[in-house]
Every structure is written in structure tokens, then in C-alpha cells.
Design a protein with these regions (language model features):
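Structural register within alpha-helical repeat arrays
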Residues: 16, 23, 56-57
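TPR-adjacent "capping" and linker segments in tetratricopeptide-repeat scaffold/adaptor proteins
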Residues: 2-19
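Start-of-helix register in tetratricopeptide repeats
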Residues: 18, 52, 86-88
């Protein structure tokens, strides 16, 4: 059904989100950082995989000096998961501010 949804312009399914995540992981392993970041971002925007895509996205941004992408990611994380333990995201936010 995910294929039909994407074919006819419907909303992506949870299957699509997992497929995007797997593709991002493969691109990361190959060293295609831009492609990996784009697909992690798709998964984050999709929302069905919860916290799962945030960590690799943030790690890649930090490792490859893509600091300008992190403020939006942090904002989305805080909005979606306001009750989560945010100690780690606080540290990332502080480091991002220092880098920018």
C-alpha cells in the first residue's frame, strides 16, 4: 500500500518511513552524508519512527560540521517529545549554539 500511496501522492506510511530510514543508514555507511541527512530528515518529518532517526541525524550533523541544520531538528524534537528526558538534547543545543 505504501507504494500505491507514494504513486498516487498519498501520505507516506510507517513502512515508507522505515524504508527511508534503512536507505539513510546505507547511505551513511557508504559515506554519502548529504543523501543520508536528507533521508533522515524525511523520516523525522514523517514522524512514525519516533525518536529513532534523531540520534543518527544529530550525530552526522555534528561529525560533518552541518551545525546549521541542528536548531530546527532540536525544535522538532522538543515539540514532539516534550516529556522525554531532554538532558542529552540540552547538551546538543548548547554545543550547537557554541558552534554557530
Amino acid at each position: 500500500m505504501g507504494f500505491l500511496n507514494s504513486l498516487f501522492g498519498g501520505a507516506p506510511t510507517k513502512y515508507d518511513a522505515q524504508k527511508y530510514f534503512d536507505y539513510a543508514e546505507k547511505q551513511k555507511a557508504k559515506g554519502n552524508i548529504v543523501e543520508a541527512l536528507n533521508y533522515y530528515a524525511k523520516v523525522i518529518n514523517h514522524g512514525d519512527l519516533g525518536v529513532k532517526p534523531f540520534v543518527p541525524y544529530i550525530e552526522l550533523c555534528m561529525e560533518h560540521d552541518e551545525w546549521e541544520k541542528l536548531p530546527a531538528c532540536i525544535k522538532v524534537y522538543r515539540k514532539r517529545f516534550p516529556k522525554e528526558n531532554s538532558g542529552w538534547i540540552d547538551k546538543i543545543e548548547k554545543e550547537t549554539i557554541e558552534q554557530l
